[in-house]
Amino acid sequence: KIFEDPTTSYKYSISMTTRHMREGEIDGVDYFFKTKEEFEALIKDDQFIEYAQYVGNYYGTPVQYVKDTMEEGHDVFLEIEVEGAKQVRKKFPDALFIFLAPPSLDDLKERLVGRGTESDEKIQSRVNEA
């Protein structure tokens, strides 16, 4: 709810990914969707604060988006995997990190199934990765 309040300075970062857009998602709102080739070119140009591969897709936080958002006066929150957080920690040692995890792997699987957006195979892959 805090990110929906127009009077707050908090803004949720929009990540970039190579995964396919799900039904109802909007490019530039939910994620910045890129091809694998586009994403890899951005990696070569050092255009990410952090990036990682997860379940066969790239995910990353674009440097320019975060810089622009901060210049607008916002405090930016990133929702990233542990490997990405390690990269951010190296670049920004004073950043505040909060780790959130589901109570159990069964709860994680239940949440993923409840979304209704992924195949059983993809869900199992994500649970195994966790």
From Swiss-Prot:
Gene Ontology CC: one annotated term: cytosol
**Xref: SMART domains:** GuKc
**InterPro entries, per the entry:** GK/Ca_channel_bsu, Guanylate_kin-like_dom, Guanylate_kinase, Guanylate_kinase_CS, P-loop_NTPase
Q: Print the keywords alphabetically.
A: ATP-binding, Cytoplasm, Kinase, Nucleotide-binding, Transferase
Q: Key word Nucleotide-binding present in the record?
A: yes
Q: Member of which family?
A: Belongs to the guanylate kinase family.
Protein name as it appears in the record: Guanylate kinase
Organism per entry: Staphylococcus epidermidis
Encoded by which gene? gmk
